[in-house]
Regions:
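Membrane-proximal helix-loop-helix interfaces that form the catalytic/acceptor-binding platform
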Residues: 13, 17-513
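Membrane-interfacial, low-structure loops and terminal tails that flank and connect transmembrane helices
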Residues: 1-15
Length: 514
């Protein structure tokens, strides 16, 4: 079952490129760890999944999720465990994504160096190390960096099974990894399917032990896929609070640009736009053709690989993209909608684009390669410097964090009445009040079990639904007419572009009894 790598031996100059590869790996790790330590303000998409941790048990996380969220069960369990043991801080919630992102970069470096000649491997490592999407996903409380790690954890033994003279052990390892991977990453389904398809022809021509091991791999993968699909379907069936819309419909609507248009005549423009958009943003790129250069490098890499490398390994790298496209055709998983949804494709994109970039560089002069390396280093160093100077995703989340810091500090250990349900208000505000030292009541009610008060704060977000009936002040005055408003705190966010984002107004009123 031996299937040779792209080159069986590396030239002497690989010593230099090994050092370059190590340098890029170090830069990528430093950027990821630095961005994590800069502690960007937590934002809505992170909190919407985190809001499932306080009230749901580990078993309940296998069922419906609130706030239109979908996430693999093992990732949810790991995050809930950290939430319970390390607390609700953003650094605690982002720790697992950071570890996954750093490990993924190291595994990618190992994989690239195993597959390709020195300079091509260094280019492939650099593309992943300094790309903004893998870096940002490593510091986000979402499972995307885990998708990347799981993809590499499956590709490495799959490659070993294709290239080693005794593939049984690599295939057996893959049989153990596969069901775990499918429960840790939903897109791992594409990697698992590609692996089974690529290994089938060679396994069936091998010794009986290899065939039986392959059948075991099929069995464990089927079990993991079945469990993953069942849990995913439970989550997709979750109600969203909007009549006749569940999470699945919400996801389809939100990621509609990741599915082919109804008119077949528009399929080719849609496909080309998706393929040259964010899905290929390594090291940089954008939607609407913004990653065309990376696509061209990847195509050149495919051509180069077909001339010199293993066709089976090339199929292993390309099939996940094909399966992703097929899933988009039946509206099961978006294609090209966002780079964060396609982190499982990052190894394939970076390896092929790195090989294509290497093919473009001169074989006689070192200066073009040096210049490209310096540009890529500047991308990584510039990204780290930008994160240091502007440590936030969007200014509104800086304002939200500052507003809630002031509000929570003002409330102290007093009682707080939040005039809204948790699910109807800005989730950043809900998260902070949920973990504030103050005693908090929701939907206009006094904190449960707290009926003896002298000071009560009332928190209101303008534009959010409020409960019918008397206000907190009216209720308290009905119990004791000495209650009155004594202090007002107003927080206003004027957005830079009011047409895209409405202003946010929050009010805190202190009620005291004379």
């Amino acid at each position: 079952m031996t299937d040779p790598s792209l080159f069986s031996a590396k030239p002497q100059t690989s010593t230099v490129w090994w050092k370059v590869a190590c340098l890029f790996t170090a830069v990528g790790l430093i950027w990821r760890i630095g961005r994590y330590l800069f502690d960007f303000p937590i934002w809505g998409d992170e909190i919407m999944v985190a809001l499932n941790f306080p009230d749901k048990s580990y078993t309940e996380l296998l069922g419906h999720l609130d706030h239109c969220q979908v996430a693999p069960p093992l990732w949810l369990w790991a995050e809930k465990f950290l939430y319970e043991t390390a607390g609700p801080s953003s650094l605690a919630l982002r720790f697992i994504p950071l570890i996954a992102g750093c490990l993924a970069l190291v595994l990618h470096a190992w994989f690239a160096w195993t597959l390709m000649p020195g300079r091509a491997a260094a280019m492939a490592i650099a593309l992943l190390a300094v790309a903004i999407w893998p870096v940002s996903m490593s510091t986000l409380t979402k499972p995307y960096s885990t998708d990347l790690l799981v993809a590499l954890a499956m590709l490495l033994p799959a490659h070993a099974a294709l290239t080693h003279t005794r593939p049984v052990w690599a295939m057996a390892l893959l049989a153990i990894i596969s069901p775990v991977a499918l429960l840790a990453s939903f897109p791992a389904m594409f990697i698992a399917g590609s692996t089974l398809l690529v290994l089938l022809p060679a396994a069936w021509k091998s010794a009986p032990s290899t065939r039986w091991t392959y059948l075991a791999l099929v069995g464990t993968t089927a079990i993991g896929a079945w469990a993953s699909i069942q849990i995913g379907q439970n989550q997709l069936a979750s109600p969203t609070g909007t009549a006749e819309i569940d999470t699945q419909q919400g996801m389809v609507d939100y990621w509609s640009h990741g599915f082919p248009p109804a008119d077949p005549l528009r399929w080719i423009p849609w496909f080309l736009g998706a393929l040259t958009g964010q899905i290929m943003a390594y090291p940089v790129g954008a939607a609407n053709g913004g990653s065309t250069l990376t696509v061209l490098m990847a195509i050149l890499g495919v051509v180069t690989w077909m001339r010199s490398g293993s066709k089976s390994v090339l199929a292993l790298l390309l099939l996940p993209l094909v399966l992703n496209f097929m899933a988009a055709l039946v509206h099961r998983y978006p294609f090209g909608a966002s780079c964060r949804l396609a982190q499982f494709l990052a190894p394939s994109v970076c390896l092929l684009a790195g090989l294509g970039l290497d093919a473009c560089l001169s074989r006689t002069s070192r200066w073009p390669a040096v210049l490209v390396s310096l540009v890529l280093l500047a991308v990584g160093g510039g990204g780290l410097a930008r994160d240091w100077m502007w440590p936030y995703r969007d200014p509104v989340f800086v304002w939200m964090r500052g507003t809630m810091d002031d509000a929570v500090q003002a409330a102290g250990n007093d009682s707080v009445v939040v005039n809204h349900r948790r699910e109807s208000m800005e989730c950043v505000f809900a998260w902070r009040w949920l973990h504030a030292p103050a005693k908090v009541g929701w939907n206009g009610s006094l904190p449960q079990g707290e009926r003896s008060h002298d000071r009560v704060w009332v928190f209101t977000q303008e534009g959010c639904p409020m409960p019918p009936g008397p206000t907190a002040l009216e209720f308290l005055k009905s119990q004791d007419p000495r209650w009155r408003e004594t202090r007002f705190l107003n927080f206003q966010y004027p957005p830079p572009n009011p047409q895209k984002q409405p202003p946010i107004h929050v009010e805190m009123v202190l009620l005291e009894r004379d």
